[in-house]
Amino acid sequence: MSSYFVNPLFSKYKAGESLEPAYYDCRFPQSVGRSHALVYGPGGSAPGFQHASHHVQDFFHHGTSGISNSGYQQNPCSLSCHGDASKFYGYEALPRQSLYGAQQEASVVQYPDCKSSANTNSSEGQGHLNQNSSPSLMFPWMRPHAPGRRSGRQTYSRYQTLELEKEFLFNPYLTRKRRIEVSHALGLTERQVKIWFQNRRMKWKKENNKDKLPGARDEEKVEEEGNEEEEKEEEEKEENKD
C-alpha cells in the first residue's frame, strides 16, 4: 500500500497518545507505557517503534531472569510496579501470629470480665450436667420394689422343707389358723406357706394319676395275670384234644 493512500487514512483518526487511557497496565513499567508510546500516522517513524519494542524486550528479559533466579515464581506485577507487594497499598505486612496475639491480648484487656464470665458459664454447665446425671430422675423400672413383695423364687431351707412335708403328709389342706401357726413357727409369711402347699398339691397330682384310685394299678395287674392263666388253660385243652 502506498503512502498516497495511507497518509489520508491516518489523518482522519486521532494519534495514539490521545487514545491512550489514563491508567497503566501493571505488566509494563510506566516509563515504557508513556515516554516511549507508539505513534501512528504521518508523524510516526519506524525507528521510534523499534526503540519502544527494544525497551519492552529488555524489560521482559530482565524480569524473566529475576523470576528464574528466585526460589518461587512471582507475579510480574510485583516486579514492574513498586517492588514489594506488601507496600503497594501503603502499609507493611505484619506476621499473623503476632497480630493474632495482639488482638487476643487487646480483647482480654478491653473486656476483663470475659474470662470470669466464661469460668462461671463452665461451672454452671457442669452443675447442670451433674443435676441431670443425679439419681433423682428415676423410671418406674428403676424403683425398688416394696418390702412386702419380693421378686424371684423363694428358697426354703432344709428344715423348713422338712416341716412342711410333715405337715402336708398329715393334712394336704391347711386352715387359716393352722397356716398362721406354721408360718410363725418356720419364720415365713402366710402367703409363702399357702404357695408352697399349692405347688406341693400340684406335684402330687402329677406324680399320681388323679383319675384313678391308689389301688387301681394293682387291680389291673391282677386282671392281666388272670387273662394269661385263662389263655394257658385254653392252649392245654386244645393240645389234649389233638
Curated annotation (Swiss-Prot):
Residues 149-208 bind DNA. One of its GO terms (molecular function) is DNA-binding transcription factor activity, RNA polymerase II-specific. Gene3D superfamilies: Homeodomain-like (1.10.10.60). A motif (Antp-type hexapeptide) lies at residues 138-143. InterPro entries: Antp_homeobox_TF, HD, HD_metazoa, Homeobox_Antennapedia_CS, Homeobox_CS, Homeodomain-like_sf, HTH_motif. Disulfide bonds: none annotated. One of its GO terms (biological process) is regulation of transcription by RNA polymerase II. Residues 221-242 have a biased composition (Acidic residues). Residues 114-154, 206-242 are annotated as: Disordered. One of its GO terms (cellular component) is nucleus. It is found in: Nucleus. It comes from the Eukaryota. Residues 206-220 have a biased composition (Basic and acidic residues). Keywords: Developmental protein, DNA-binding, Homeobox, Nucleus, Transcription, Transcription regulation. It holds the Pfam family Homeodomain. Residues 116-136 have a biased composition (Polar residues). Its main location: nucleus. Sequence-specific transcription factor which is part of a developmental regulatory system that provides cells with specific positional identities on the anterior-posterior axis. Belongs to the Antp homeobox family. Interacts with HOMEZ. Forms a DNA-binding heterodimer with transcription factor PBX1. This is Homeobox protein Hox-C8. The lineage of its organism: Eukaryota, Metazoa, Chordata, Craniata, Vertebrata.
